[in-house]
C-alpha cells in the first residue's frame, strides 16, 4: 500500500506526474535586460462587478436560509402532530419538535442576515458607479 499513489485532492492534474525539465520553454533560458512595465488600473467597473457578484451570492444564501427555515418549521409541525398521535413516544417527539423549531428560528435569522448583506452590497454597487439615486423621502 505504501507504493501506491494516494491522491488527497478531488482533481488530479497530469502535469504533476511529468518530470521537471531543465530548460524553461517560455524564454528558452535566455536573459535580457529589457524591462516591461504593466500598469493596472482598478476602475469603478471592476468594483461594481464585484459588488454585484457579492449581492448575487448573498441573495442565493438568503434563499437557502429561507428554504431551511421552511423545512425546519414543517418538520417541527410534523413532530408536534406525531406527539399527539403517538402518546407512548410523546416526550421524544416534543423534544425533536423543539429542536426543529430552534433550527427554524436560526435559519430564519440567517436569511435575515443575508438579506441585509445583500442590501448593503446593492448600496455599495450603486455608490461605486458614482451615480446616486435621489430618494426624496428616506
UniProtKB/Swiss-Prot annotation:
CC per GO annotation: cytoplasm; nucleus
Keywords: Cytoplasm, Nucleus, Stress response
InterPro entries named among the record's database cross-references: ABA_WDS
Keyword check for Amino-acid biosynthesis: no
MF-aspect GO terms: sequence-specific DNA binding
Biased composition, class Basic residues, residue ranges: 1-13
Disruption phenotype: No visible phenotype under normal growth conditions, but mutant plants are hypersensitive to drought stress, and have decreased sensitivity to abscisic acid-induced germination inhibition and oxidative stress-induced growth inhibition.
Presence of keyword Cytoplasm: yes
Induction of the gene: Induced by gibberellin (at protein level) in the nucleus. Induced by abscisic acid (at protein level). Induced by aluminum in roots and shoots. Induced by abscisic acid (ABA). Induced by drought and cold stresses in leaves. Induced by cold stress, osmotic shock, salt stress, ABA and ethylene.
Region span, Disordered: 1-27, 106-138
Major localization listed first in the record, in broad terms: nucleus
GO biological process assignments: regulation of DNA-templated transcription; response to aluminum ion; response to oxidative stress; response to water deprivation
Pfam families found in the cross-reference section: ABA_WDS
Misc note: Plants silencing ASR5 exhibit delayed flowering, abnormal panicles, reduced seed number, reduced number of trichomes on leaves, palea and lemma, and exhibit sensitivity to aluminum and drought stress. Plants over-expressing ASR5 exhibit enhanced tolerance to salt stress, osmotic shock and drought stress.
Record's function text: May function in gibberellin signaling pathway downstream of GID1 and SLR1. May be involved in the regulation of plant growth in the basal region of leaf sheaths. Involved in tolerance to aluminum. Regulates the expression of different genes that collectively contribute to the protection of the cell in response to aluminum stress. Binds to the promoter and regulates the expression of target genes involved in aluminum stress response. Binds to the promoter of STAR1 gene, which encodes an ABC transporter required for aluminum tolerance. Involved in drought tolerance.
Family statement drawn from the similarity comment of this UniProt entry: Belongs to the abscisic acid and water stress-induced protein family.
Protein name (Swiss-Prot/TrEMBL): Abscisic stress-ripening protein 5
Gene this protein is translated from: ASR5
Amino acid at each position: 500500500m505504501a507504493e501506491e499513489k494516494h491522491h488527497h485532492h478531488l482533481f488530479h492534474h497530469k502535469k504533476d506526474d511529468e518530470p521537471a525539465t531543465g530548460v524553461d520553454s517560455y524564454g528558452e533560458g535566455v536573459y535580457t535586460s529589457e524591462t516591461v512595465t504593466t500598469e493596472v488600473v482598478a476602475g469603478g467597473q471592476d468594483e461594481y462587478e464585484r459588488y454585484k457578484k457579492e449581492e448575487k451570492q448573498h441573495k442565493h444564501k438568503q434563499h437557502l436560509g429561507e428554504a431551511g427555515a421552511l423545512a425546519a418549521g414543517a418538520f417541527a409541525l410534523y413532530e408536534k402532530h406525531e406527539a399527539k398521535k403517538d402518546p407512548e413516544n410523546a416526550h421524544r417527539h416534543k423534544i425533536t419538535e423543539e429542536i426543529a423549531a430552534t433550527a427554524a428560528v436560526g435559519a430564519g435569522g440567517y436569511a435575515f442576515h443575508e438579506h441585509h448583506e445583500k442590501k448593503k452590497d446593492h448600496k455599495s454597487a450603486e455608490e461605486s458607479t458614482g451615480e446616486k439615486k435621489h430618494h426624496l423621502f428616506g
